[in-house]
């Protein structure tokens, strides 16, 4: 599908649930957020229907997210069914890793193509401070289990919420020790993310070069998104940056998002989109559903404008509710 600005949109991120087994400080309050009822979230049959229609329109890659997608029963089974849809080329998963080790075999059987693990620190006490839960040991069990399968693409996503440079050095060191790509993701001012000091790509890169030596740009692409990568001598994996704030990549954006309650939207910043759940439960045909999906794509905003004055169209929900 091509939007009105000429961008090819072939990537759909699907939030399976707004629930999570962690309470990361930049994502939700310690007490959590009011969870949607089972009746409010899309059924797997509804998700599959959307995926089939989206594939017919040109969507080729699906990312399963949350909340934490692995807390919803049957995640691997859904992934397997999505993989079987004609036109779908890749199905990937973003997880906090807590439940990964115990569900990895089912995910591999489903044919999952890649797994991204969200991890912001290697320090158990800092992990507990950021996530407000224990669990670092479980995350590493998941990482080690995934590393036992060399054909599985594994990446670490790290939000620089802890400003101490030793933390950046430690996280990046995973790419030195293992064949893992470590990506630092600039905090976007959405939900609780607005409350934290901003750490930009250049400051993190300077810390890493001081610790590990020169970083050289790598032209290869690893995955579906806008990450740009660097190599470091002696590293088994690459270091990447997703820098939506300082290196705006909206002109190359290739995605739309589906929230767990069935709202499809074109940009993280804005509430603008369409309630696909309401259409389906109202009895729409597949042709009508496809037209609704196409309109979201066609009307995808030209860019985010987080530096501009707030508007009534700005998203008011947090990342766990939108889908990370």
Question: What do these predicted ranges mean?
Answer:
Residues 32-37, 123-130, 190-195, 275-276:
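A short acidic, helix-capping loop that chelates divalent metal ions and anchors anionic groups
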Residues 1-11, 176-177, 187-324:
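Auxiliary Fe-S-binding modules of radical SAM enzymes
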Residues 23, 27, 72, 125, ...:
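Residues that scaffold the ATP/ADP-binding catalytic core of kinase and kinase-like folds
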């Amino acid at each position: 599908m091509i939007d009105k600005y000429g961008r090819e949109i072939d990537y759909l991120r699907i939030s399976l649930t707004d629930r999570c087994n962690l309470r990361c400080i930049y994502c939700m309050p310690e007490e959590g957020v009011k969870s949607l009822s089972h009746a409010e979230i899309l059924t797997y049959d509804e998700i599959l229907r959307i995926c089939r229609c989206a594939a017919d329109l040109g969507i080729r890659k699906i990312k399963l997210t949350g909340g934490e997608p692995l807390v919803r029963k049957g995640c691997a089974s859904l992934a397997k069914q999505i993989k079987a849809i004609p036109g779908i080329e890749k199905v990937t998963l973003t997880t906090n890793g807590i439940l990964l080790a115990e569900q990895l075999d089912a995910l591999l059987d489903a044919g999952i193509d890649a797994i991204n693990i969200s991890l912001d620190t290697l320090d158990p006490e800092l992990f507990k401070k950021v996530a407000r839960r224990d669990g670092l040991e479980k995350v590493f069990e998941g990482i080690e289990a995934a590393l036992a399968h060399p054909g599985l693409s594994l990446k670490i996503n790290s939000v620089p919420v802890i400003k101490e440079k030793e933390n950046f050095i430690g996280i990046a060191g995973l790419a030195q020790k293992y064949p893992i790509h470590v990506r630092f993701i600039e905090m976007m001012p959405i939900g609780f993310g607005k409350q934290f000091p901003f750490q930009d790509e250049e400051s993190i890169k300077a810390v890493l070069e001081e610790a590990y030596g020169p970083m050289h740009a790598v032209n290869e692409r690893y995955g579906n998104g806008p990450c740009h990568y660097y190599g470091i001598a002696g590293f088994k994996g690459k270091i990447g940056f997703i820098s939506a704030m300082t290196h705006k990549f909206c002109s190359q954006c290739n995605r739309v998002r589906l929230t767990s309650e069935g709202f499809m939207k074109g940009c993280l910043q804005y509430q603008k989109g369409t309630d696909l759940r309401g259409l389906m439960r109202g009895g729409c045909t597949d042709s009508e559903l496809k037209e609704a999906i196409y309109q979201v794509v066609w009307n995808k905003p030209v860019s985010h404008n987080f530096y501009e004055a707030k508007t009534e169209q700005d998203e008011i929900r947090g990342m766990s509710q939108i889908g990370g």
